[in-house]
């Protein structure tokens, strides 16, 4: 037997070590949970009756589409993930799943989610979901993230689309209400992720990702966080006086906005290392609570309107 034959036998075909948990990790469950939540609010506030089976189908398809995007993102960012401590334990850097397996998994789920939503619900929603996946995978992952400090600003559009897709699933159209939801998430994304990037700057620099703190420095990032937070608070409060959302939402948005703005000011003010790290972490954590509470208020208002005729 030749040396080549012996080597071929020794190497052999790679046997995947992945288990179910690894494939679940590819879906980015935390991101999926946020997508499902914001999409659910889009469904709840949409006008008209929507059959529960179609509602569940829509949420499932949007969730699977988000998971597909996550899997494709990990497949295309395996080189970056392996260099960052925050992502080094993901399935691909650990060698549990190959990039080819993740690509196949993500592509399969993408087609399944889009086709199922289009066939069973409506093709407008299916097309929006397809665009969301495309934008996240191609525009953000392959282009923006690697080449510009505005990566999460422009790329944030993908994360802001799920409630729009959900509204379209119910109505087959787009209206001002889902556009407001889109804008809230869009302007929420930069302060949220830049706060994370401020205490993960070394991680991003090591991986060569041009996040704003790496490219422009922490002071410029703090200013941008404050400016985007001011816009976010204004955008989030605007639907109330304009008549799109109720007064309860308006009061909650102002209260949450005050907290968000205060923490953004703290991030801007505190420049020493330890106080700065604490301020960044507080803003990052509160921003999650901010978005959840804001959207939950809309959802609870919608549920209250649904059950009011049954009570009175």
Swiss-Prot record:
Transmembrane segments: 34-54, 56-76, 119-139, 152-172, 179-199, 225-245, 248-268, 283-303
Subcellular location: Cell inner membrane
Protein name: Protoheme IX farnesyltransferase
Keyword Membrane: yes
Pfam families to which the protein is assigned, alphabetical: UbiA (PF01040)
Gene name tied to this protein: ctaB
Miscellaneous comment: Carbon 2 of the heme B porphyrin ring is defined according to the Fischer nomenclature.
Assigned protein family: Belongs to the UbiA prenyltransferase family. Protoheme IX farnesyltransferase subfamily.
């Amino acid at each position: 037997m030749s040396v080549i034959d012996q080597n071929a036998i020794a190497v052999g075909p790679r046997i995947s070590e992945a288990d179910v948990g690894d494939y679940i990790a590819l879906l980015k469950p935390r991101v999926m949970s946020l997508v499902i939540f914001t999409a659910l609010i889009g469904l709840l506030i949409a006008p008209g009756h929507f059959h529960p089976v179609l509602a569940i189908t829509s949420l499932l398809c949007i969730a699977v589409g988000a998971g597909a995007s996550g899997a494709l993102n990990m497949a295309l960012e395996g080189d970056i993930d392996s260099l960052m401590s925050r992502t080094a334990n993901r399935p691909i850097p650990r060698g549990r799943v190959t990039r080819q397996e993740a690509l196949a998994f993500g592509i399969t789920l993408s087609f399944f989610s889009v086709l199922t939503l289009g066939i069973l619900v409506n093709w407008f929603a299916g097309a929006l979901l397809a665009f969301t996946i495309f934008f996240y995978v191609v525009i953000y992952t392959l282009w923006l993230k690697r080449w510009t400090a505005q990566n999460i600003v422009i790329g944030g559009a993908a994360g802001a689309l799920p409630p729009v897709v959900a509204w379209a699933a119910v109505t087959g159209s787009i209206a001002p209400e889902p556009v407001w939801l889109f804008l809230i998430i869009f302007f929420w994304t930069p302060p949220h992720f830049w706060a994370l990037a401020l205490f993960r700057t070394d991680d991003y620099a090591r991986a060569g990702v041009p996040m704003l703190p790496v490219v422009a420095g922490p002071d410029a990032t703090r200013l941008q966080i404050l400016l985007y937070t001011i816009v976010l608070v204004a955008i989030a409060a605007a639907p109330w006086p304009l008549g799109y959302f109720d007064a309860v939402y308006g009061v909650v948005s102002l209260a949450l906005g005050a907290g968000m703005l205060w923490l953004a000011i703290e991030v801007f003010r505190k420049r020493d290392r330890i106080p700065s790290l604490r301020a960044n972490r507080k803003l990052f954590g509160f921003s999650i609570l901010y978005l959840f509470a804001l959207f939950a208020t809309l959802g609870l208002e919608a549920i209250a309107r649904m059950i009011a005729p049954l009570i009175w």
